[in-house]
Amino acid sequence: MVKASRDFQVFVKPEGSACNLACDYCYYLSKAALYSGSEPVRMPEDVLERYILQHIEASPAEVIRFSWHGGEPTLLGLDYFRKIVSLEKRHRPPGQGVVNGIQTNATLIDEDWCRFLADEGFTVGISLDGPEEFHDFHRRDKGGQATHARALRGFDLLQKHGIQADILCVVNAQNVQWPERVYRFFKRIGAAFIGFLPLVERRPEAAAGVSPATAPSEAFGGFLCTIFDEWARQDVGRVKVEMFEEAARTAFGREPAVCVFRQTCGDVPVIERNGDFYSCDHFVDANHRLGNIRETSLAELLESPRQRAFGRAKAETLPRACQVCEVRAMCNGGCLKDRFITTADGEPGLNYLCAGYKKFFTHCRPFVSELAALWRSRQAGPGKTAPQKIGRNDPCPCGSGLKYKKCCLGKSRLHT
């Protein structure tokens, strides 16, 4: 049995790009063009079982994590997910834990879904772009109707059943101008974890090189700084914000949890509905299709020279300006998909979000460094040497009251 050399997270898309919404910024809807009408509309049971078994066999982690994505995965129906759980229970080794995560637009969530997700211990991520006017600007259904009320109803139902769903908010040219309104809306509805995903749509033919909906880099940095200041004053230990956790991980000597900020990537591939393996969710194209799990095992694909080369390219193509940047350890050049502008001296490969990232990481660094120093001094005690890193059984520095291993250790939230 071949194990992967590192932990990994697969974005599995059993129904491909199929979705009941038609969000105008969605980069995945167009992936339907990769597959002809002869392909299955959903992952067949034999491919599903093969994937689950291979994932379990390949995982080196103490807890095996599955991430179900789309499109919109709830279109598969509850019976399909019951089959998923049944197959996982059939194949998992005795005593080994399995955790499932699902990323959904929440518009189809009802009482039955909530009971199932709660009973089976699913983690849930919901796409919600803030107050109604921001969310509905881009996130409409195929009939052009608004979706905010339906998504919020799904979020509320999940809370009623004891499921604290994570929020994934796409930050774009509209809502980036209103950081306080966006953040306070999420606090008002009871969100405990928020991921802010900047929208970057490359448009080489446009004067700005990006679409009008793209969040301006400096504005995105300011958006994060404004929210960070309110969070630092009022919400440490109450609300988790993924970008803030990532900044803190560096100060605490931890590797970034989100692939965007790691030195290398390649550990978050995609499995499409027919078993095709792609290097990354943002690189689902013919050049990055490495094989199919019906012919090559998941572990072999993860460890393949092409996949490892894809991951190393993140560090190997880092511009010189990034290599000497004061916040490199927090950023590591960002995602490869966004590296399409040039540095001040004309070197290509700079991240479009560089100015915003630098603005935010420079702004928050004194606070998170002080937090780390305070934690080390408290952990050291009289006559002891302050630990340089957080131990698995130490209290989580986020203030949740949980042990680090039960809270922020190794969290790689649903980022797309």
Name the predicted role of every residue range:
Residues 137-149, 156-265, 270, 274, ...:
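Radical SAM enzyme [4Fe-4S]-AdoMet core and its adjacent flexible, acidic
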Residues 284-328:
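Membrane-interface junctions of multi-pass transporters
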Residues 51-53, 57-67, 76-201, 407:
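Radical SAM/AdoMet-radical enzyme domain recognition
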Residues 373-416:
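Acidic/negatively charged segments and metal-coordination signatures
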Residues 1-13, 61, 377, 382-387:
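N-terminal [4Fe-4S]-dependent radical SAM core
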